[in-house]
């Protein structure tokens, strides 16, 4: 086999391999994009809150050591008072941590109020 023929064959085989690799990579990119879009829909609510600088429900639950799924008003108030007093700056605590505890309490309280509103039946309004 002559040298020009070998070089030509090398170029043809190399371009075939590269084109197959690009096609395969493109298919993988499409599959990843489709999979990512379904995951993003689920996480969009919490990521929107984070972008706005708000605390997420999971973060608030972590701060007060409460599972958001088993949220009760009495337990929330008890944990809030305990953590708020522990972090009192007059007792050697941190104002920053105390404010985080306060914001966590606000977030979980609003979530609890929202759950209560959803569970209570809507009262019909009647006009006389």
From Swiss-Prot:
One protein family per Pfam: Pam16
Top-level lineage group: Eukaryota
Subcellular compartments: Mitochondrion inner membrane
Region (Disordered): 108-128
Biased composition (Polar residues): 117-128
Molecular function GO terms recorded: ATP hydrolysis activity; protein-transporting ATPase activity
Membrane topology summary: Peripheral membrane protein
GO biological process terms held by the UniProt record: protein import into mitochondrial matrix
InterPro entries recorded: J_dom_sf, Tim16
Any one Gene Ontology cellular component term annotated for this protein: PAM complex, Tim23 associated import motor
Chief localisation class: mitochondrion
Record's keyword terms, sorted: Membrane, Mitochondrion, Mitochondrion inner membrane, Protein transport, Translocation, Transport
Positions of the UniProt region annotated as J-like: 59-113
Alphabetical list of PANTHER family matching this protein: MITOCHONDRIA ASSOCIATED GRANULOCYTE MACROPHAGE CSF SIGNALING MOLECULE (PTHR12388), MITOCHONDRIAL IMPORT INNER MEMBRANE TRANSLOCASE SUBUNIT TIM16 (PTHR12388:SF0)
Described purpose of this protein according to its UniProt entry: Essential component of the PAM complex, a complex required for the translocation of transit peptide-containing proteins from the inner membrane into the mitochondrial matrix in an ATP-dependent manner. In the complex, it is required to regulate activity of mtHSP70 (ssc1) via its interaction with PAM18/TIM14. May act by positioning pam18/tim14 in juxtaposition to mtHSP70 at the translocon to maximize ATPase stimulation.
Assigned protein family: Belongs to the TIM16/PAM16 family.
Subunit structure comment from the entry: Heterodimer with pam18. Component of the PAM complex, at least composed of mtHsp70, mge1, tim44, pam16, pam17 and pam18.
Name of the molecule in the record: Mitochondrial import inner membrane translocase subunit tim16
């Amino acid at each position: 086999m002559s040298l020009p023929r070998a070089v030509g064959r090398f170029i043809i085989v190399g371009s075939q391999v590269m084109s197959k690799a690009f096609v395969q990579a493109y298919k993988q990119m499409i599959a990843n994009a489709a999979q990512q879009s379904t995951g993003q829909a689920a996480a969009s609510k919490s990521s929107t809150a984070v972008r706005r600088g708000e605390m997420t429900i999971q973060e608030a639950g972590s701060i007060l050591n409460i599972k958001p799924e088993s949220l009760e008003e009495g337990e929330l108030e008890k944990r809030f008072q305990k953590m708020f007093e522990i972090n009192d700056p007059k007792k050697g605590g941190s104002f920053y941590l105390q404010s985080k505890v306060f914001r966590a309490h606000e977030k979980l309280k609003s979530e609890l109020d929202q759950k209560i509103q959803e569970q209570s039946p809507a009262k019909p309004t009647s006009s006389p």
